[in-house]
């Protein structure tokens, strides 16, 4: 059992995973995760019913398994991204960099490919230029071989005569482009719709989720995870009975409503340390719908509702078979600057709570063809070194970084890199003109900071927020403070000698 990743998320045992699924080549019963020690999900009573264990697979022949060719995935990537501002001031949330060389959109995309699902739609709306560019370069420009699959970007659109404007929620986004999907489904024999978020960090075999959905003959299946009290109010919380059927759903409850959603999570003691610390089961925002059920909910039964979590799902419980799939691996919702910062910092730890590298289920991203990193007389502890870095006589700890000059020190920081290089001659010319080159200058000390792309930080700068300011807006000076973390804006310049 692993150590707790945070007080809000349960420490979970990482399962062993099979290679990318090719449905036609499957032989025998599906291998369970946790190395065969237990089921990858549990169906158990978390209301008044006694807990019981239900294995995911019962050793049926491969002919009874779900076909990934009958599944289409839709990634919701069109939110305003206000909670990740200023990182989302010029980009959509799924385009935000993570882990040194990836984008958040790479997480659900890679999970789909590794699950054998190759019919993927990405819905976009706000600040979508960089997201569209990344998707094209990575998944449409010859980088990934889809065989008979496809990736299609569905931009927000308005039909003639519509009173409303842009997408007003997750369900409304679906409703406005459903005519495109209906035309697609007619020709592709799609039976199940997988709905995903573009702002989470996790590794999941989606076909295990789909298989449970089929085995239970569910109309809707929610993927859920145990969470602690500190962040429970940020999520939609669920209760389900001994058969796994969801009996209550509450979106971001507070006060007494939050207390009422507590459950007995002792049935998860096979996977987490001290389940009592994680008394809530949260919806991950990952859903599987029967195709016809989804179309009926959006076009007829709940045609006036805009959001899945807060409006449609609580109502659908009463007249549909809504099942829960409890996910017991690492999962982090990247919904705020604090959670984004903590998730990136955790990637630097040894061993990390989440590992991007897995030869059987790799994460894909756009190739950048950068040269190897060069370093000289540096002291580095628990850090992620980006491609093509230049490091000179610097000290780095718990940091993801790029270009640093002599005497600089970074601790608990994240640098997102730059779009282009500046040569030594260009840097010398800029400094002779009193300007600041890209990267971190000499003798600069930085801690608890996120440095967005193409930032120019001068010499003898100190960024530490010693006064402990929690929130501040200083766009004219090139930075914001969110949850006590200093965020240097994209393309910002911090002049020599500045103290933040």
Curated annotation (Swiss-Prot):
Keywords: Allosteric enzyme, Amyloplast, ATP-binding, Chloroplast, Nucleotide-binding, Nucleotidyltransferase, Plastid, Starch biosynthesis, Transferase, Transit peptide. Insensitive to 3'phosphoglycerate and orthophosphate. One of its GO terms (molecular function) is glucose-1-phosphate adenylyltransferase activity. InterPro entries: ADP-Glc_PPase (IPR011831), ADP_Glu_pyroP_CS (IPR005836), NTP_transferase_dom (IPR005835), Nucleotide-diphossugar_trans (IPR029044), Trimer_LpxA-like_sf (IPR011004). Coiled coil: none annotated. Residues 1-47 are annotated as: Disordered. GO terms for biological process: glycogen biosynthetic process; starch biosynthetic process. It comes from the Eukaryota. It is found in: Plastid, Chloroplast; Plastid, Amyloplast. Residues 1-33 form a transit peptide. Pfam families: LbH_GLGC (PF25247), NTP_transferase (PF00483). GO terms for cellular component: amyloplast; chloroplast. Pathway: Glycan biosynthesis; starch biosynthesis. It catalyses: alpha-D-glucose 1-phosphate + ATP + H(+) = ADP-alpha-D-glucose + diphosphate. Its EC number is 2.7.7.27. This protein plays a role in synthesis of starch. It catalyzes the synthesis of the activated glycosyl donor, ADP-glucose from Glc-1-P and ATP. Belongs to the bacterial/plant glucose-1-phosphate adenylyltransferase family. Heterotetramer. This is Glucose-1-phosphate adenylyltransferase large subunit, chloroplastic/amyloplastic.
